[in-house]
């Protein structure tokens, strides 16, 4: 069987609110950490989200 190429990741808010999104990423195409600007409903603003591991 083929090895999994996509890995589940958690996008954690840099505002420190504890809010996160879950998504997948291709390990081969994007080996470095993701940084995306997404909406944080806790503070009701768009904020930078950093990649973290799912436990």
Curated annotation (Swiss-Prot):
Q: Which family does it belong to?
A: Belongs to the bacterial ribosomal protein bL33 family.
- InterPro entries per the record? Ribosomal_bL33, Ribosomal_bL33_sf, Ribosomal_zn-bd
Q: Which UniProt keywords apply?
A: Ribonucleoprotein, Ribosomal protein
Name any Gene Ontology BP term.
translation
Coiled coil located at which positions? none
User: Which terms in the GO cellular component ontology are assigned?
Assistant: cytosolic large ribosomal subunit
Q: Does the keyword Ribosomal protein apply?
A: yes
Pfam families assigned: Ribosomal_L33
> What is the name of this protein?
Large ribosomal subunit protein bL33
UniProt-listed PANTHER family: 54S RIBOSOMAL PROTEIN L39, MITOCHONDRIAL, LARGE RIBOSOMAL SUBUNIT PROTEIN BL33M
- Which Gene Ontology MF annotations are present? structural constituent of ribosome
- Annotated TM spans: none
